[in-house]
Amino acid sequence: MSSLVGFLSLVFAIGINFYLFLSRYIFKFQKQKFNLFIRFSSLLTLLSFFSLMYAYVVSDFSNYNVFQNSHSNKPLIYKISGTWGNHEGSMLLWLSILSIFSFFFSFTKNIDESFQRLTLIIQSLLHILFGLFIVFTSNPFLVNSILVNEGLGLNPILQDPGLAVHPPISVSYTHLTLPTIPQV
């Protein structure tokens, strides 16, 4: 069930961002409505990530990603860090961090409205591209075609406390999209 919730929330977030990207050329939104859509899209993306994390924590082996990268006897810290300890989960983490920065940037009050809108539209384009990449090539919400009672376990190389602190590195790279956009 968490796989379905995660997948659908990711697809809806991509759809909202596609709508926002088109709004630059077709629709003329008010700032409040535009920012509301950005925030809703960000929350849907976070719901998608936390759905995957929930599947890891409860050892939902009906999710193929969880089956491939987790085991019911793993400590909780490795179940949580197993969420981003693989390609699919890491891409979803990156997209979630990008969404968090878009969410907070949409609350910014002391900048030019057209600059803020253009920055968020480019962030929406990044969200669309990464979201489509995740959905079509790196889907972490694939359903396991066979019933299994146990997962294969996390790669032994990744069973390190350093994996648990990996997200700050992703945050440091991802937040650089906001100051880079005005330079483009």
Go through each PLM region and give its residues:
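Structured, charged N-terminal subsegments at the starts of enzyme catalytic cores
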Residues: 75-77, 96, 101, 120-147, ...
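Membrane-interface helix-loop junction between the first two transmembrane segments
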Residues: 19-36, 61-65
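Central hydrophobic cores of alpha-helical transmembrane segments in multi-pass inner-membrane proteins
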Residues: 12-25, 42-49, 74-78, 94-109, ...
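Membrane-interfacial loop-to-helix junctions in multi-pass inner-membrane proteins
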Residues: 29-45, 104-128
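Short aromatic-rich membrane-water interface segments that cap or initiate transmembrane helices
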Residues: 1-7, 71-90, 152-171
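Conserved small/polar residues in nucleotide/adenosyl-binding loops
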Residues: 174-180
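Transmembrane alpha-helix boundary signature
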Residues: 50-65, 106-116, 132-145
